[in-house]
C-alpha cells in the first residue's frame, strides 16, 4: 500500500528561509488518508527547518538520519547534507534538496519546490518573488495555496516554518 502526495516549497528572501508544506497524505491514487500531516518541522534546537515529500517511511527515515548528521556535524547544514547524501546513495544561509538517490541540490534562485504540486508551487513562488515585496514565509504559503488549488494530491492545511 503506497502512500504519496505532498508539496513542499522553500523560499529564501531578505536573509530568511521559509518552508511551507501541505498536510495531505494520499493512499494509492485516489484516497485521501490524512489531511493534517506535519511534513515541515524544526530540528537541531529549532535552528534548522526541514520539509519532506515522498514515501512516508522513507521521509521519516531520511529526516531522522539528517538530524543525526546535523548533530554530528555541529549544525553545519552543508556538511550534514553532503555526508548524508554520500551515505544514502541514499544554517540559515543554505537551502538544499537531498534526493532519495543522494543528489544534493542548491537552487540558484533561492526557491525550490518538491512533490506532486512542486511545479505549480515553484512557478507561483518565482512569480511572487519577482513581482511582490512579500516575505519568504508569505511567498511560500501563497505558492502552496496555488499548488493546492490545482494538484489533487496537495491540500490547503499548510504549515510554514521560518529561520
What does each model-found stretch correspond to?
Residues 2-9, 87, 91, 95, ...:
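C-terminal binding/interaction regions
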Residues 1-92, 119-120, 129-134:
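Conserved short S/T/G-enriched processing/targeting/catalytic segments and their helical context
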Residues 30, 38, 45-48, 103, ...:
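Short capping/connector residues at structural and topological boundaries
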Residues 21-23, 29-32, 61-63, 97-102, ...:
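Short acidic, glycine/serine/threonine-rich loops at helix termini
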Amino acid at each position: 500500500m503506497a502512500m504519496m502526495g505532498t508539496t513542499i516549497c522553500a523560499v529564501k528572501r531578505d536573509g530568511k528561509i521559509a518552508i511551507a508544506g501541505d498536510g495531505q497524505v494520499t493512499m494509492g491514487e485516489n484516497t485521501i488518508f490524512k489531511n493534517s500531516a506535519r511534513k515541515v518541522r524544526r530540528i537541531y534546537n529549532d535552528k534548522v527547518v526541514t520539509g519532506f515529500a515522498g514515501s512516508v517511511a522513507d521521509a521519516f527515515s531520511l529526516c531522522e538520519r539528517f538530524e543525526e548528521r546535523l548533530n554530528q556535524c555541529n549544525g553545519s547544514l552543508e556538511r550534514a547534507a553532503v555526508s548524508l547524501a554520500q551515505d544514502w546513495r541514499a544554517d540559515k544561509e543554505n537551502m538544499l534538496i537531498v534526493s532519495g538517490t543522494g543528489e544534493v541540490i542548491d537552487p540558484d534562485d533561492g526557491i525550490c519546490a518538491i512533490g506532486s504540486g512542486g511545479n505549480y508551487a515553484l512557478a507561483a513562488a518565482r512569480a511572487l518573488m519577482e513581482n511582490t515585496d512579500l516575505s519568504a514565509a508569505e511567498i511560500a504559503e501563497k505558492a502552496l495555496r496555488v499548488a493546492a488549488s490545482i494538484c489533487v494530491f496537495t491540500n490547503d492545511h499548510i504549515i510554514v516554518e521560518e529561520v
